[in-house]
Amino acid sequence: MIWNEEFETLPREQLEILQLKRLKDLVERSYYRVKPYREKMDEVGIKPEHIKSLADLQNLPFTTKDFLRDNYPFGLFTLPLDQVVRVHASSGTTGKPTVVGYTKRDIETWAEVMARALACGGVHRGDVVHNAYGYGLFTGGLGAHYGAEKLGATVVPISGGQTKRQIMIMQDFGSNVLLATPSYALNIADTMADMGVETSSLSLRVGIFGAEPWSDNMREEVEKKLGLKAIDIYGLSEIIGPGVSMECIEAQHGLHIFEDHFMPEIIDPDTGEVLPMGEEVNLFSLH
């Protein structure tokens, strides 16, 4: 299902014109407003006026986890804090968390790409969406919440935990969409089995699962135990959160990237060479 026909079906030529404009704007803002970015670009001899085509993207330096941590917490913001309406952060399990600031417009963009993602995954206006992603500094809960509301669904903002209560709520509210990590979806299924709750007592049709790796075997197990179609979603807080790309319910053959907002590159990590589609190496994204 397509949410935003204008941009999701944009002809490639028009899409690339839009991408180049946004790339130029992004590089200019980063260079002139953020000293660490300017120093990083100066090191490789890149200035905003050097961006003439999308091919010039490969000349930009990488932004790494260490670079983000070195400028913790707000050193990479392009706007003053009085224009930043929200801050999210990673868990920081391997060091200082990586921090991302959102303007009001960023929040609107996030809602837009998440609405596209949920529609792509089979969520419809009027669905009852049981959102069991965590709310807080983690981006999952609020990102999914915004997208579902924009799509016109009814959101149950339950977050994680209290699994027995969650099962009761899904039964009583007639929830037909489950948003959660795949491991928590299995937790729900196992708790249902322990309680003697039949899958048929739920109205679940589709589950949108992400925020952690999961296998095809895990997908099959979730689908069997919860009686739904399990769909994969991808995102990361350093870019925007969930909503970067999404598996479609029709084909389930890879993930669709919303290319008017995110530009993927396939890069050999050893040589830095940009490779054609189909190569299995590292994926880099620009937002």
Predicted regions and their residues:
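Nucleotide 5′-phosphate-binding alpha/beta core
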Residues: M1-A89, T94-E112, R116-C120, D216
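Short glycine-enriched loops at secondary-structure junctions
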Residues: V84, I107, G134-G136, S183-Y184
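Acidic/glycine-enriched edge-of-secondary-structure segments
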Residues: G95-T109, H145-V155, S175-L179
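Short, conserved acidic/polar surface loops in the N-terminal third of protein domains
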Residues: V99-T103, V123, G140-G143, A189
